[in-house]
Structures are given as structure tokens and as C-alpha cells.
UniProtKB/Swiss-Prot annotation:
Name of the molecule in the record: Enolase
Organism lineage: Bacteria, Pseudomonadati, Pseudomonadota, Gammaproteobacteria, Alteromonadales
Residues annotated as binding Mg(2+): D246, E289, D316
Pfam annotation, one family: Enolase_N
Listed SUPFAM superfamilies: Enolase C-terminal domain-like, Enolase N-terminal domain-like
Required co-factors: Mg(2+)
Cofactor note: Binds a second Mg(2+) ion via substrate during catalysis.
Main location class: cytoplasm
Length: 431
């Protein structure tokens, strides 16, 4: 009854108005699953390949009909009759069929959409919520926790059309007792930040991930605005709420230096790490993501040395959810946390392997969306299933972001005390 009888691919739209891939997997007995692949704006060079058509006369080259054809052709043929509950086998069949290091033949977007659809179909067959099925696949059945949200309320960099260099300024409601309470805290800060910006005559337009995107004099100004918003909302910064940054430093790394054009400053690798450290001394910043370029391993070693015992240093472009690269980081004491993005590696099985490797090494784990999202909320289930501890899925507006928060509310309601919200204890470095 769990045999695959059909696999369907189609082109749909993501939250930025670009095409992306959606897949369906159908099983005997009428069970099925459907999932969509997200897409990033600031991407690591070692990510698995997102296959685009390149036809400039259609969606400016961003169509995904080639990836869809791969689903409806070779992938479908290879998976017909296979057992959907054997996720590792399905993913390996697709990986072998592709035969490349970065999935550039079939496309990571095609493979991922089918991988996640198969997991949903298998969960349906087993009569389980998706998080419970993923937990079984991960060997963590019944070991649930609700993630601390990393809420991107102010955008810069590649996620916004403004002069702010750092890509994301986020709040984490670490003092909340439940996920529902944490969501309320974040929403109230978000709405108060809007008022603060309006009072200063600044733009309240939003970026790709729903955060505000005003022009500000400096990155420190962004932190100051958020501090005011937190206080206006009635919360204590550093106690109820901590701050987090995603520098996406690869985006402003040029010729061995870090060029913050918005501030008119240029830093060496160590100089930029010192600059970030100075910000952590002025504000209660508990987490910094991609604080250096993905290839600047010497710089990362210094950054980890000076901040790794106090601050969560998250590798996104650095590790790209890849166990081979993560192992190098672990072996060399680089960073102390990993950002997990399904589409950086291209299958559920490989994603779970990266999460387990990180946790086994004492690294913290942050499950993440991409800037180009859909209504698909699989990452919410993944975060709970693996007890990841943290989730990064945007601001408190745009339904593509809120869909994940709403799914987490439903899961918390279902699990109750079986899925505790641990708050501050989830955000700690390895040391």
C-alpha cells in the first residue's frame, strides 16, 4: 500500500514572483503528498544546483520547466513501485540517477520537491503528522521541542533595496514560556518597530522576508531602532529578547576585504570580526550568521576564537547543509552552529544527516527558510521533529512566512508538554 504509483512535477510561483518546482507523490490506496522547493537570494557557491531553464524570453531565464520535465520523466520512472516509507532509498535513487556532486543534472529543486513529497505521502500512509514521520526517519521519535524563532524584522543586503549592509536584523524571544507566547512577543515588537520608523519619517516597506527595509545611516542605527521597539513593546532587551544578525558577508566581500558601502567603511577579515564583536558589546546580540565570507576560513578561525565562547556563530554559506564541509568546520573548530536549508543540499535524507552531525559535535542547529518561499510549511515540522531548537522563517507579515509560524502553533497545540519551548538554553555556543 505504500508503493509509489505516480510522481507529478509542475511549475508554480514563489513569493518573489519567480517560478519554482512543486511535486506530488501518489501511493496505492489514495495516499499522497505535495511539496515545493524554495529559492535563495544570497546563495553559497557550494550549494546544490537549482536548475533553471535559462530561456531569457520566458520569466527572464528563471523558468523551471527542465526541472519539471526531470520529475515527470526520469525521476518518475526510477521511483515507480518503490516504497515511499523508505526515504533513504528514494533519495539515494535520485542522487545516483543524477550522478553529479551538486545535482546539476536533474536539479536540486527537482530532487528536493520529490523527496519532501514522498515524506508527506509516507506520513499520510502511516497516519502520522509529518513531524512524527520525520522524527522516525531521524531516529528521534517522541523527542520533540518547539524552536525559538529567529524573527527577521529589519532587512538589508540582498533582501532589500536600501543602503543597509547587514542582511538581517532579528529578534529572538528567549524569555517566553511557550512558542505561542514567543510569537506574540515578536509580533508586538514588529508592530512597534513600524511605529518607530513612521515617527522618524522612514520607510515601512518590507523586504523579501517581511522585515522593514528603511534607509539608515549605519548598521548600528538598525540595532538602535530595534532596541527602542523592544522597549516600546514592554519587553527587556537581553532578558526577554536577544538580538541576532545575518551578515551574509560573502555579498560584500571584495578582494580580500569587507566593503560596507552603506557605512563607507572597508575592513580586513580580522577587522570586521572586531567590528562585530564591538556591536555585541553594545547590544545583547546572541547570534551572528555568516559573519565572514564562505571561503575565508582563516578569518572564521579568528572570529570563532574571539567570540565562539560567548556568541552563537552560525555557518550558512559557510557550510551549505553539507556534511563534508561541516566536518571540516568541526575538525578545525570553525563556528559553533549550522543553518539548515533543505535546498542547499537537495534531499531530506542528506538534510537529516547534517543535523545529526552538527548535534553530535555540540553545534547548535537553526532550521531556515529561503528568501524565495511558498506556502509550504515543511520546515516547521522539520524543526520540531529533530528538536533543532531554533527556526528562522522571516518576519510577522507575508503569508509565505506566517504559514510556518501557524504550522508551529498547530503542532504545539497537538503536542502540548511533549514539545517544550526551552528559550535561552537553545542559543548557546559550543564552548
Amino acid at each position: 500500500m505504500s508503493k509509489i504509483i505516480n510522481v507529478i512535477g509542475r511549475e508554480i510561483m514563489d513569493s518573489r514572483g519567480n517560478p519554482t518546482v512543486e511535486a506530488e507523490v501518489h501511493l496505492e490506496g489514495g495516499f499522497n503528498g505535495m511539496a515545493a522547493a524554495p529559492s535563495g537570494a544570497s546563495t553559497g557557491s557550494r550549494e546544490a544546483l537549482e536548475l533553471r531553464d535559462g530561456d531569457k524570453t520566458r520569466y527572464m531565464g528563471k523558468g523551471v520547466l527542465k526541472a519539471v520535465a526531470n520529475i515527470n520523466g526520469p525521476i518518475r520512472d526510477a521511483l515507480m513501485g518503490k516504497d515511499a516509507t523508505n526515504q533513504a532509498e528514494l533519495d539515494q535513487i535520485m542522487i545516483d540517477l543524477d550522478g553529479t556532486e551538486n545535482k546539476d543534472k536533474l536539479g536540486a529543486n527537482a530532487i528536493l520537491a520529490v523527496s519532501l513529497s514522498a515524506a508527506k505521502a509516507a506520513a499520510s500512509f502511516k497516519g502520522l503528522p509529518l513531524y512524527a514521520h520525520i522524527a522516525e526517519l531521524n531516529g528521534t521519535a517522541g523527542q520533540y521541542s518547539m524552536p525559538v524563532p529567529m524573527m527577521n524584522i529589519l532587512n538589508g543586503g540582498e533582501h532589500a533595496d536600501n543602503n543597509v549592509d547587514i542582511q538581517e536584523f532579528m529578534v529572538q524571544p528567549v524569555g517566553a514560556k511557550t512558542f505561542r507566547e514567543a510569537l506574540q512577543v515578536g509580533a508586538e515588537i514588529f508592530h512597534n518597530l513600524k511605529k518607530v520608523l513612521q515617527e522618524k519619517g522612514l520607510s515601512t516597506s518590507v523586504g523579501d522576508e517581511g522585515g522593514f527595509a528603511p534607509n539608515l545611516a549605519s548598521n548600528a542605527d538598525a540595532l538602535a531602532m530595534i532596541k527602542v521597539a523592544v522597549e516600546k513593546a514592554g519587553y527587556k532587551l537581553g532578558e526577554d529578547v536577544t538580538l541576532a544578525l545575518d551578515c551574509a558577508a560573502s555579498e560584500f566581500y571584495k578582494d580580500g576585504q569587507y566593503d560596507l558601502t552603506g557605512e563607507g567603511k572597508v575592513f580586513s577579515a580580522n577587522g570586521f570580526s572586531d567590528f562585530l564583536k564591538s556591536l555585541t558589546e553594545q547590544y545583547p546580540i546572541a547570534s551572528i550568521e555568516d559573519g565572514l565570507d564562505e571561503s575565508d576560513w582563516d578569518g572564521w578561525a579568528y572570529q570563532t576564537q574571539i567570540m565562539g565562547d560567548k556568541i552563537q556563530l552560525v555557518g550558512d554559506d559557510l557550510f551549505v547543509t553539507n556534511t563534508k564541509i561541516l566536518k571540516r568546520g568541526i575538525d578545525n573548530n570553525i563556528a559553533n552552529s549550522i543553518l539548515i536549508k533543505f535546498n542547499q543540499i537537495g534531499s531530506l535524507t542528506e538534510t537529516l544527516a547534517a543535523i545529526r552531525m552538527a548535534k553530535d559535535a555540540g553545534y547548535t542547529v537553526v532550521i531556515s527558510h529561503r528568501s524565495g518561499e511558498t506556502e509550504d510549511s515543511t520546515i516547521a515540522d522539520l524543526a520540531v521533529a529533530t528538536s533543532a531548537g531554533q527556526i528562522k522563517t522571516g518576519s510577522l507579515c507575508r503569508s509565505d512566512r506566517v504559514a510556518k509560524y501557524n504550522q508551529l502553533l498547530r503542532i504545539e497545540e497537538q503536542l502540548g508538554e511533549k514539545a517544550p519551548y526551552r528559550g535561552r538554553s537553545e542559543i548557546k555556543g559550543k564552548a
